[in-house]
A protein has these predicted regions:
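Oxyanion-binding and handling regions
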Residues: 1-24, 31-39, 90-231
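Short, conserved beta-strand segments within well-ordered enzyme catalytic domains
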Residues: 17, 29, 58-60
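Short, conserved active-site loops that position catalytic residues or coordinate cofactors/metal ions
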Residues: 42-44, 63
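Generic structural marker for isolated residues within well-ordered, non-membrane alpha-helices
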Residues: 44, 78, 99
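Phosphate/pyrophosphate-binding loops at sites that engage ATP/ADP/AMP, CoA/4′-phosphopantetheine
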Residues: 44-58, 150-158
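Short, well-ordered alpha-helices that flank and scaffold nucleotide-derived cofactor binding pockets
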Residues: 46, 79, 83, 104-105, ...
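Phosphate-handling active-site elements
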Residues: 49-56, 82-93, 108-110
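DPxDG-like acidic metal-binding loop motif
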Residues: 60-94
Length: 231
């Protein structure tokens, strides 16, 4: 019996889902901008109680892009559960676990390709295409002008965003093509079930880490800071 617990906390609309032997045993959503850390544990405990002695096979966690603190909380919870339950954990890009991304993986889908767009802040935006395996490519950064050119070159793609479309700096025609959506824990499981064993093992072997739009920024201590003074 395969039992999979999924955690998605990269967005304020967080969710947890438990799937076992072809059936959904538990799903919960909770909304929080600041305190995922205090809200995630109750639904996790409720989900684990429903295992009723069955072993947990895998813990999945959405790795963003999204809230840095929210994503880190989900990763920490996944790591802790994997240790406690002696099972592997794997991270999946949250963009793939959205309804538009999953819709192109269905037979006879209206669209055969999907691309996510997002606000990367400081005048930059990102795009991420959904691969044939159902996963999301690494986000690619660009300015507004290049973004419009890229989107105009893929007129048949299903476009979606985790942000408000009005924040993307696009013309009205392109905005009308874009669907706003959110990742869901149950769709992390959906992505996972569609992967072959080779890809699953690759994901197991990768350390859990957030999907960064930019390299993590570390501020340098100013000259004269107590830590820089010579003893």
């Amino acid at each position: 019996v395969e039992s999979i617990l999924a955690i998605e906390t990269s967005v304020p609309e967080a969710s947890i889902a438990l799937w076992s032997d072809g059936a959904w045993l538990f799903e919960a959503e909770f909304v929080s901008d600041r305190n995922h850390n205090s809200m995630v544990f109750e639904p996790l405990a409720q989900a684990l109680a429903l295992l009723e002695g069955r072993e947990l096979s895998t813990v999945l966690v959405g790795t963003g892009p999204g809230s840095y603190s929210g994503t880190r909380i989900g990763i920490a919870a996944a790591q802790g559960l994997a240790i406690a339950k002696s099972c592997p954990a794997a991270g999946i890009g949250s963009i793939a676990a959205t309804p538009p991304a999953r819709s192109v993986a269905r037979p006879a889908a209206a669209h055969t390709a999907a691309t996510a767009i997002g606000d990367a802040r400081r005048g930059l935006y990102y795009i991420s295409s959904i691969t044939a395996s159902g996963e999301a490519e690494e986000p690619e950064l660009m300015d507004a002008a290049v973004l419009e050119q890229r989107l105009a070159s893929i007129p048949d793609d299903l476009l979606f965003t985790l942000d408000a479309p009005t924040t993307l700096g696009l013309n009205d025609q392109l905005q009308e093509r874009i669907t706003r959506t959110q990742p869901q824990a149950r769709l992390l499981v959906d992505v996972w079930l569609g992967l072959d064993e080779v890809r699953r093992q690759q994901l197991y072997s990768k350390p859990l880490a957030p999907t960064y739009l930019r390299a993590p920024f570390t501020s340098k201590a100013k000259q004269g800071h107590p830590l820089l003074r010579k003893g």
